Amino acid sequence: MAAQYGSMSFNPSTPGASYGPGRQEPRNSQLRIVLVGKTGAGKSATGNSILGRKVFHSGTAAKSITKKCEKRSSSWKETELVVVDTPGIFDTEVPNAETSKEIIRCILLTSPGPHALLLVVPLGRYTEEEHKATEKILKMFGERARSFMILIFTRKDDLGDTNLHDYLREAPEDIQDLMDIFGDRYCALNNKATGAEQEAQRAQLLGLIQRVVRENKEGCYTNRMYQRAEEEIQKQTQAMQELHRVELEREKARIREEYEEKIRKLEDKVEQEKRKKQMEKKLAEQEAHYAVRQQRARTEVESKDGILELIMTALQIASFILLRLFAED
């Protein structure tokens, strides 16, 4: 990320910044995927193809249908696929402040970092605006994110009988330049496909993503901003878990007081034992309920009002520190 909020990037060049494979904990059973590209490139439809069902709203429109970063998930081979669809924040006319806010939202939704960054480009006429948006994306993520990036060509169905490799050999120079950057890390999709064709291309893409993950030693893309955001999320999660612990102890004390008062008033030993068992059952139910809440504390934190502002504040503080570092160099 750049040092200043409002012109933020994923490409900090500060001394000591950490890039490349990051720890997958606490989400080591997840495969986190981010879709980026210009408005109308087919990001939402690609997300639906990856997840195997229609969960993102997609369609043909001059303006972005997706208004802010959205996260959806599904299961695949005992792995949770987490896909984040981004709006047209990388379009050249979008203000940097708006881009920055959605980048922070993307960080929140994919922390501690994505395993794959999918650059979505439609096949066909590659306009100057599309080229500029692509350049903005590549610059924003930086050279060191390239090993996590995959090029996705949408509208494969527009090729008709033309072979993809034949098309790419005759493609415009800008597309050829992209191919030089991504090498064999590319895939073409027909997002209108159904049945066997849909499953086959889904398996091909997920296989490519798995290959990228292996090549990056099972790690995820990270940088100082992701690390700072993850620290804030974990801090808030621990605070939430402590709150749940206090609530549980308070509720258990209330239950004990209620039942012990009733037990004291009983003279029948059998009735006393019956009430004790009822109390123990009630306590066990509360412990089970709060155990689930503890496990879901992170999700609760990520979805609560105000967390985006907390992350923004944390990253702005980090940005201030980075600015000081630049000034001292």
UniProtKB/Swiss-Prot annotation:
Tissue expression from the record = Highly expressed in spleen and peripheral blood leukocytes that contain mostly T- and B-lymphocytes. Expressed specifically in resting T- and B-lymphocytes and expression significantly decreases during B- or T-lymphocyte activation. Expressed at lower levels in thymus, ovary, colon and small intestine.
Renumbered residue ranges of the record's region G3: 85-88
Tell me the segments the record calls region G2: 64-68
Which keywords describe this protein according to UniProt? Coiled coil, Cytoplasm, GTP-binding, Nucleotide-binding, Phosphoprotein
Subcellular location per UniProt equals: Cytoplasm, Cytosol
- UniProt-annotated stretches for the region G5: 190-192
Any keyword Nucleotide-binding?
yes
G1: annotated segments: 37-44
Q: Where is the AIG1-type G domain?
A: 28-230
- GO CC annotation: cytosol; intracellular membrane-bounded organelle
Per the similarity annotation, which family is this?
Belongs to the TRAFAC class TrmE-Era-EngA-EngB-Septin-like GTPase superfamily. AIG1/Toc34/Toc159-like paraseptin GTPase family. IAN subfamily.
Q: What does this protein do?
A: During thymocyte development, may play a role in the regulation of apoptosis. GTPase which exhibits a higher affinity for GDP than for GTP.
The name under which this protein is listed is GTPase IMAP family member 4
Biological source species: Homo sapiens
Q: Which gene encodes it?
A: GIMAP4
